[in-house]
Design a protein with these regions (language model features):
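Glycine-rich, basic loop-to-helix element that forms the pyrophosphate-binding segment
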Residues: 38-54
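Short beta-strand-to-loop element that shapes/binds the nucleotide-sugar donor at the catalytic cleft/hinge
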Residues: 90-106
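C-terminal catalytic/acceptor-binding lobe
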Residues: 153-253
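Short beta-strand-to-loop acidic/aromatic patch adjacent to the donor-nucleotide binding site
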Residues: 57-67
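Aromatic-glycine-rich donor-binding/catalytic loop that engages nucleotide-sugar donors
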Residues: 135-154, 166-167
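A recurrent flexible, glycine/aromatic-enriched loop bordering the glycosyltransferase active site
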Residues: 115-135
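Acidic donor-binding/catalytic loop of UDP-sugar-dependent glycosyltransferases
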Residues: 66-79
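Short, acidic, metal-binding catalytic loop of nucleotide-sugar glycosyltransferases
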Residues: 2-13
Length: 253
């Protein structure tokens, strides 16, 4: 993945900031522009911590099961500097299929109401989504970033983009796809905790929140340090303690 990032971003400097329970591999530890912050919290908590510690002018939020397309991030930064004001965001379009196979995503996929779980009265029908996004780092922090009461990174990504749009920002689609993401049709062994978080907490929380037609008028800005209100040890994942490595996670699920 790191090698593909370098090919996607040749003309601009970048830093890869990650957060999670395990240290960097020997190979990544040799790279000057890669940082790992150790934390045992939920995916949302870790993403928030990583984002807060980002130093760059722009913040790109993406996923780890992705391969970056050559020159794609360069093109997105070019577009950002051409069309975006501080409150605007680039939707880093992606494909998702088994073994990173490029696929076509319907143009309506990038609109909230294309997705059943997002069809609530508090979500305007013309709002767009950007699970992978390029945003001004300081503006991200002013907004408060991700709401970490959502444990997994899905609904709080939508929530952030809805808050951006309510605040007057525009979501511009990337010129081309930025990543090809992997997809597992039968789920993954290590995704049990994620599925539980999605079903038991995040989806009902989002539904309750956005059933209010005025929700966005009340919560454009949230506390940046909201991650501190979450579990330091994510109990869904680490009920038996923190494993020594990723293989132990697979064995215990």
């Amino acid at each position: 993945m790191y090698d593909s990032i370098k090919k996607s971003c040749k003309r601009y400097s970048f830093e890869l900031v990650m957060c999670g329970p395990f240290p960097l591999t020997e190979e990544l530890a040799k790279e000057d522009n890669v940082r790992m912050i150790i934390d045992n919290g939920s995916p949302s908590r870790c993403a928030q911590i990583a984002a807060i510690n980002a130093d760059g002018r722009l913040l790109a939020h993406l996923v780890d099961d992705a391969l970056f397309i050559e020159d794609s991030l360069d093109q997105c930064v070019d577009l950002y500097d051409t069309v975006c004001d501080k409150k605007d965001v680039i939707n880093l379009r992606y494909t998702e299929a088994l073994n990173f196979r490029p696929t076509h995503m319907h143009k309506d996929y990038w609109y909230a109401w294309f997705h059943g779980p997002l069809k609530h009265t508090g979500v305007p029908k013309d709002y767009k989504i950007a699970c992978h996004h390029l945003i001004d780092t300081e503006y991200f922090k002013e907004l408060g970033g991700y709401d970490c009461s959502f444990e997994y990174q899905n609904f709080n990504l939508h929530d952030l983009m809805f808050r951006v749009q309510k605040d007057g920002g525009t979501l511009f689609d990337s010129p081309n796809n930025v990543t090809n993401c992997d997809w597992y049709p039968n789920g993954m062994v290590d995704h049990k905790a994620i599925e539980q978080a999605y079903v038991d907490n995040d989806e009902p929380l989002f539904a309750a929140m956005y059933s209010d037609p005025d929700v966005l008028s009340k919560r454009i800005y949230i506390e940046l340090d909201n991650w501190k209100q979450t579990e330091e040890l994510w109990s869904r994942r680490f009920s038996k303690g923190v494993p020594k490595d990723y293989n132990e996670i697979l064995e215990n699920n």
